[in-house]
Amino acid sequence: MAEAFTREDYVFMAQLNENAERYDEMVETMRKISGMEGELSDKERNLLSVAYKNVIGPRRAAWRIVSSIEAKEKGRQKPNAKRIEQIRVYRQKIEKELSDICNDILKLLQEQFVPRSTNADAKVFYYKMQGDYYRYLAEYSSGEDKEKIAGSALNAYNSAFEISQQLPPTHPIRLGLALNFSVFYYEILASPDRACELARKAFDAAITDLDKLTEESYKDSTLIMQLLRDNLNLWVTDSAGDDNAEEK
């Protein structure tokens, strides 16, 4: 009989899934780890994030492309009703996949990861992740549904933001939260002033503390700081908001 997998075996398997770029399998592997006792380690948390980010990312990109094609088709002088219906059905198929992925990780976060977390960086990580996946749901929602989902995202981001003040301004998790929270304000709540204020404060605080950066987090922190600055430049020059902001 085959020997049962240990936690270390599943971590190795998740890394193998990642190297092979088989992210659907990586999600399944991480779900097995999530069913085990105890908190996730920093390494396991990052693997969880990578797994879900890489199954949701291509579908978010696909939705944007299909939605753009749909808008162009509807904008023609003589729209083709059959083509528009084909596109609509396909877009809804992608939306169903997006919803399934988001609801899956949100359930894990709510029922397992958030309640188990005991330290500040883990709590910020999970609340940020909650905010992110509610934001992804809000991207293709409308009306009252969008308002409700955006409210859930805002609550999660606010919880993360409050706890993040316990972390150094240069901490990659705190910076990553500021980056994605500001994107939420800009793209979902259409609040460019609030987005710029949040991003600028996070960037300025990190600059002031730059000399305290550890070698271990230097690369991650400075990369996110660059993304914050890129977004600020984009948002100041692009009042129309057509371009997609950088996120972590």
Swiss-Prot record:
Homodimer. Homodimerizes via N-terminal domains. Oligomerizes forming homotrimers, homotetramers and protein filaments. Oligomerization is hindered by polyglycylation in vivo. Interacts with a large number of both cytosolic and membrane proteins in trophozoites and encysting parasites. Interacts with a serine/threonine protein kinase GL50803_112076 (gCDC7). Component of a multiprotein complex containing gCDC7 and GL50803_94117 (gDBF4), a regulatory subunit of gCDC7, during both the trophozoite and encysting stages of the parasite. One of its GO terms (molecular function) is kinase binding. This is 14-3-3 protein. Keywords: Cell projection, Cilium, Coiled coil, Cytoplasm, Cytoskeleton, Endoplasmic reticulum, Flagellum, Isopeptide bond, Nucleus, Phosphoprotein. A motif (Putative polyglycylation target motif (T/G)X0-1(D/E)X1-3-G(D/E)X1-2(gE)2-4, where X is polar or negatively charged amino acid, and gE is polyglycylated glutamine) lies at residues 237-248. GO terms for cellular component: axoneme; cytoplasm; cytoskeleton; endoplasmic reticulum; motile cilium; nuclear envelope; nucleus; spindle. This protein may be used to design small molecules that inhibit its interactions with the target proteins. The inhibitors could be used as drugs to treat giardiasis, a disease caused by this parasite.
